[in-house]
Amino acid sequence: MSTSLLARRKHLMALGALAAGSVLRASGAAAERAQARVASIGWTAADVLLSLGVTPVAAAEKYNVNVLSVDPRQQLPDNCIELGLTNQPNLELLHALRPDLIVVDSRHLAIENQLQAIAPVFRLNIYGDPGGLPLERACDQVLKLANALDITVRAQRYVASVDASLQDQRKIVDSLGGTPRVLAVQLFMDGRHLNVYGKNSMLDDVMVRLNVQNAWQGATPPGHVPTLGIEELDSMPDTLLLYMSDERYAPIALHNLASSEIWRRLPLVRHGHLAPIPRLYPFGGLNTALQFGRELTDALVRYRKIA
């Protein structure tokens, strides 16, 4: 993407005002909107709110949201009330909290009608229908949500900072004089399978932005993640494998992979063309793009030094 994300979105602010409206405007004065009590249903919803400096008064699956964040500033605090599971939140508790707005992931819409009976609902649609271009859609959705919360200037600065960071990473990658194809994966604990992130994913969009070729070019429906057997990596000998490393699953997966003859014989394994990256949420918002851009660039710099 050669042009600035922020520049491409100047016209979207006007559209966002019409399409999303100011959901809270009916509640009263601007001061009230600025102090809106917001609840989040879905990990992406919580991630996007936190990225805008908005701490939800209540959120579903707080533990999972915090586990997926490596930045303490992007974690839900203790005084954020737990609402339970994303697909079965505690509606009675949510009603008692009387939020001004409920932000919900587009992948958790089964209860949207019930939520609308409690408070206005903002549907965050980064990975839902029609799918595709999650990086671009995340910028759009952040600005529309910010418009609803009357924090437009803050959101514009945030989007601009993400854009600037990706531009900086692109310059570093370009200076390397060529990079390998990259495969971003989540290892399975069974030591036989892995998830790959191809087109229609935030990780692929970041690769495109940094001019890095994704080794996985297979079909990837929006919002889905293909699963491969490790034997399929045999056809990717010149690929740099980036696996998400977390303290819960990665050690078990690596232990089981170490005992696999198939794994040990893979060219990319024999040549040491694999590297861990800190845990991240692949279906997050711009924070995911920001984090993966940095991790991808760092991994490519290290690869170039030892290649």
Residue ranges and their predicted role:
Residues 2-4, 10-30:
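N-terminal export signals
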Residues 5, 25-40, 44:
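C-terminal segment of N-terminal export signals and the immediately downstream linker at the start
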Residues 36-37, 140, 240-307:
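Structured C-terminal subdomain patch of bacterial secreted/periplasmic proteins
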Residues 37, 43-97:
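A short, structured surface patch at a secondary-structure boundary
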Residues 37-52, 153-210:
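Basic- and aromatic-lined ligand-binding clefts that recognize polyanionic substrates
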Residues 60-61, 200-223:
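His/Asp/Glu-enriched short active-site or ligand-binding loop at hydrolase and phosphoryl-transfer sites
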Residues 98-104, 237-239:
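Proline-aspartate-enriched helix->loop->beta-strand connector
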Residues 110, 124-144, 177-204, 249-252:
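Extracytoplasmic ligand-binding site segments that recognize negatively charged/polar headgroups
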